[in-house]
Amino acid sequence: METLANRLDACQDKMLELYEKDSDKLEDQITHWHLLRVENALLYKARECGLTHIGHQVVPPLSVTKAKARNAIEVHVALQQLQESAYAHEPWTLRDTSREMWDTAPKGCWKKRGITVEVRYDGDESKAMCYVQWRELYVQNYSDDRWVKVPGKVSYEGLYYTHENMNIYYVNFKDDACVYGETGKWEVHVGGKVIHHDAFDPVSSTREISTPGPVCTSNTTPASTQAQVGASEGPEQKRQRLEAVDGQHQQQRQGSKDSTQKAAERAGGQVDSDRTRLCDTRSAHPVRHPSDPDCAPVIHLRGDPNSLKCFRYRLHHGKRKLYSRSSSTWRWSCESENQAAFVTLWYTSDTQRTEFLNVVKVPPGIQVILGYMSIF
């Protein structure tokens, strides 16, 4: 027990030295969070051994030290990844890398240079609320977990930043408008400027993803053109024209279907009807065909993005032989930023996946979804 007390004293002495140093280097902040991990691990072990005091220090309950250790691990891993980015040599203080800053909206990223944004609901100064707009935000890409710096923005709708062609709102003024206001309108005061409801552009402020896709070559006439043509036609002419357009659309759909099937046959031989049924999106529970050699067993891990990254990091360094490949953290594009993320694990066989589930303990809060995916 004396050794435990000495280690705890040495750990806390090093932390005090860092506090007095007040460094703005990222490596010192990483050291600080490493020491916090060690401190909570020692306190956890002391409590496990039945100690309630170490010298004059009270040993917290196991649940408290466990939660603090998890928080320290999460921030420590995030800072280690940040050190490998292009922003490692920027000034990083204890305040910039604190757990409070990590949890401040938007959660799970680093922020700097905050300014105050005042929102007056109903245009009434007595109903004003203040928010923080971060001029610089450091977020991770969903595709490769690489850190990038993006500017914080403000619109009539709320506070947001643009990442991977998507506007991500972390404060929506509409949510507070029904609490602090009555008319559902407000004014945004920032940097000596005022944003009114009349200046709100719902198109440019709407959160959306720009994804490449096929160019639409439909021959459908725009609604305005149809209205102009229909005004000069009689009922019989309208019916004949609509029948002709409908027949043309059916031919286009049939031609598109045939060309898709022929392309599949050219790429992979004869199209298997059973394989086609497996890819039927109308089925709630698709079943893998036993004779299909092109499907690999997978596990989709669903949960908090940061928890998934920490869990994947532990798997990569301790259980790498129990799975074939792992994906980066990803989300469905139609879901909001607050929705859960996914990490997909690939396996060479069902036996390997079963062994993984028998050996690896999945942390609470992470959902395991079994499935199969086409090998590519």
UniProtKB/Swiss-Prot annotation:
Per the record, where are the segments of Basic and acidic residues compositional bias?
235-246, 255-265
Q: Does the keyword Transport apply?
A: no
Q: InterPro entries given for it?
A: E2/EBNA1_C_sf, Nucleotide-bd_a/b_plait_sf, Papillomavirus_E2_C, PPV_E2_N, Reg_prot_E2, Regulatory_protein_E2_N, Regulatory_protein_E2_N_1, Regulatory_protein_E2_N_2
Compartments, as annotated in UniProt:
Host nucleus
Say which domain of life the source belongs to. Viruses
List every stretch annotated Transactivation domain: 1-206
Show the segment(s) annotated as Disordered: 204-277
Q: How is it modified after translation?
A: Phosphorylated.
The record's keywords, sorted A to Z, are: Activator, DNA replication, DNA-binding, Early protein, Host nucleus, Phosphoprotein, Repressor, Transcription, Transcription regulation
GO biological-process terms attached to the record: DNA replication; DNA-templated transcription; regulation of DNA replication; viral DNA genome replication
What GO molecular function annotations does the UniProt record carry, in alphabetical order?
Answer: DNA binding; DNA-binding transcription factor activity; nucleotide binding
Q: Which GO terms describe its cellular component?
A: host cell nucleus
Where does this protein have compositionally biased stretches of type Polar residues? 216-229
Cite the residue spans of the region called DNA-binding domain.
295-376
Q: Which HAMAP family match?
A: PPV_E2 (MF_04001)
User: Family assignment?
Assistant: Belongs to the papillomaviridae E2 protein family.
Subunit composition and interactions: Binds DNA as homodimer. Interacts with protein E1; this interaction greatly increases E1 DNA-binding activity. Interacts with protein L1; this interaction enhances E2-dependent replication and transcription activation. Interacts with protein L2; this interaction inhibits E2 transcriptional activity but not DNA replication function E2. Interacts with protein E7; this interaction inhibits E7 oncogenic activity. Interacts with host TAF1; this interaction modulates E2-dependent transcriptional regulation. Interacts with host BRD4; this interaction mediates E2 transcriptional activation function.
Q: What does this protein do?
A: Plays a role in the initiation of viral DNA replication. A dimer of E2 interacts with a dimer of E1 in order to improve specificity of E1 DNA binding activity. Once the complex recognizes and binds DNA at specific sites, the E2 dimer is removed from DNA. E2 also regulates viral transcription through binding to the E2RE response element (5'-ACCNNNNNNGGT-3') present in multiple copies in the regulatory regions of the viral genome. Activates or represses transcription depending on E2RE's position with regards to proximal promoter elements including the TATA-box.
What is the protein name for this chain?
Answer: Regulatory protein E2
- Organism this protein belongs to: Human papillomavirus type 10
- Identify the coding gene: E2
